[in-house]
Amino acid sequence: MKKLALIVIFLFGSLISFAQDGPLPTRSVFAELGGSGLAYSFNYDFRFDKTRMDSWGMRVGAGGYKIGGDSFFSLPVLVNKLYGKDERFFELGLGMTFFGVDNETYSYCQSFDSNGNCIGPLVTEKSDVNFILPVDGSPNLMGTMNIGYRKIPVDGGFTWRVNLTPIFNNNGFWPLFAGIGFGYAF
């Protein structure tokens, strides 16, 4: 009985060590809603040390949209550190998001006669540039932090993340911004 138990333990241990001999999934591509890309972004994340998952890394992404006369573009760049083992990691990161906003210009009349014709001055305005915090024009930079959880399979494959993403700029600090992402680790 002891021999059988030792053989099973030896074979099982060999399979486990064999499964971990392959390359670690130190790179991933993912889509994120909210987070450092502000509205949404598509990202590439990699570890500087290809032999360890719980190490320093970097993330670069891009996102944007155009709806009517409004458009938005973002380019998040962050340095991050993963803490954990196996598939579960706590993430801390810090970076900047370059973004540009083009808001629609609109005009309106301040005074009308009894027939509904404009008799006052025609006012033309462009809506303010804001994304949660006021910003001083566009293009601009927004500082971002990343505090979150990542699940990365040891053999690669489907990965997901959820994070709290405080944002800041010269006009303030907003601690309650968040993001959720899904992607593929390889």
Where are these regions (language model features)?
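Generic cytosolic/nucleocytoplasmic N-terminal low-complexity/intrinsically disordered segments
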Residues: 1-2, 31, 162
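Bacterial Sec-dependent N-terminal signal peptides
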Residues: 1-23, 182, 186
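Residue-level marker of intrinsically disordered, low-complexity segments enriched
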Residues: 5-7, 14, 28, 117, ...
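A broad, structure-centric signal for solvent-exposed, well-ordered loop/edge residues
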Residues: 7-8, 38-40, 51, 86, ...
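Short glycine/proline- and aromatic-enriched beta-strand/turn motifs that initiate or cap beta-hairpins
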Residues: 20-74
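Outer-membrane beta-barrel transmembrane domain signature
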Residues: 53-55, 64-186
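A general structural-boundary detector
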Residues: 6, 18, 30-31, 134, ...
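A generic alpha-helix preference that emphasizes hydrophobic side chains
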Residues: 14-16, 41, 144, 179
